[in-house]
Amino acid sequence: MSALSFTLVRLGTLVRLAFRSAGNRRVNFWLTLVSIALSTCLLLTVQRGQQAIHDSFTRAVSGTDLIVGARTSPLQLMLYAVFRLGDPTHEISWEAYERVRRNRLVAWTIPIALGDSHRGFPVLGTDAAYFGHFRYGARERLQLAQGKPFEQIFDVVLGAEVARRLGYRLGDRLTLTHGTGDAPGIEHADKPFQVSGILAPTGTPVDRTLHISLDAMTAIHLNWQAGAPIPGINIPADKVKAFDLKPEFITAALVGLKSRAGVFNLQRDINADEDEALLAVLPAVALNQLWRLLDIVTRTLQALSALVLVLSLCNLVTALLASLEQRQRELAILRAVGARPLDLLFLLVQEGMLLTVGGALLGYLLLTVGSLLAAPLLLNQWGIVWPVTRFAADELWLLALVAVAGPITALWPAWRASQRALADGLTPRL
């Protein structure tokens, strides 16, 4: 037998011994493996969560130069105007919106009116410019999977996720609820809507939004005052066209410019409006504020996850050291039948690698199962597209780091085992 063949046989024997040794200590083995798996899963979850939030928020709106709303924090304005998160504290008048729309620097505007919902999904009032100018991702246009945009007053266009979750089809009828979120509210039961279109999936908050016209938003509130129906006054749906349906207020507006060179001039003019307290925000600036906030949270979670992993590796060292006392005779017998100190070193390093490689794979499996369960909830509640499988370089490097940490951590106990004298395990203690 050649030297290479002999070495391979020897290594194969040691690998089999490592597996059998782990089987003989299965309780300690599995406890250590599960702790490594959980810490790996936690690290990967933080890493994937950071990327999922970044990707979802970044692709939600593109090609919009300014977001205009009532004066508040830039981040809050962007969150409720684009991502439907939170509630607006103030509105802007239609006259203020018209002043922005007529500005010589402005190419197009999209009015946005919020405040109603349907079974927990937000309702957005807008006009035809929304379907013509709104962009997401890599400046992609909204596409209708079925039907057409709203033409009649009580037409509604559904986002893909709304239609899928609630099972709506073209021609179905539904009623809206005053107020946002899952809290119970007063239904606009006297003015039902008909589904005229269903948008193709976008992976953005558009998917979980119902879209109606601004005229419709005004119509369902004709007999309302201070957030409640006026007692004794009922305006049937077939009579609303007799009224002026121009809105008095809207929530916000998305603005596109003829040339981006004028964005700061227009922003300054809007923020300095003398008739109304307005705020114009660059989406990129507001997103940077969000990234700074998330960066603090992410780094904290990463540090905690890394600490949990270090504790799991310390547990691995402790388990190997504790097993040395129980395995003195086993190791001595291996020496007696011809195992060299280097073989014992390799044996225990193999056990450490077995634990961390198994823990890394189990951790990734736990992450995948958790992602399958959490992805629909995250998309529905916060509009975050959570990838179920993601073979990105950062995750692969993290898995490799965990796998390599095992044999490195096991070197010290393995070295101690290899230095034990043959007589230590074969001489009975009195």
Please place each PLM-identified region on the residue numbering.
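Hydrophobic, regular-secondary-structure patches
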Residues: 41-132, 148-152, 242, 270-272, ...
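N-terminal Sec/SRP start-transfer signal
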Residues: 1-44, 55, 349, 422, ...
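Transmembrane alpha-helical interface segments in multi-pass membrane proteins
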Residues: 308-311, 321-375, 405, 413
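Hydrophobic secondary-structure segments that place a key small or acidic residue at a functional site
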Residues: 117-129, 137-231
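Short helix-loop junctions at transmembrane helix boundaries
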Residues: 361-401, 411-420, 424
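Short helix-to-coil transition segments within interhelical loops
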Residues: 22, 335-342, 420, 429-430
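Alpha-helical transmembrane segments of integral membrane proteins
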Residues: 31-42, 295-318, 352-363, 398, ...
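Mechanotransmission and gating elements of multispan inner-membrane complexes involved in transport
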Residues: 187-194, 198-298
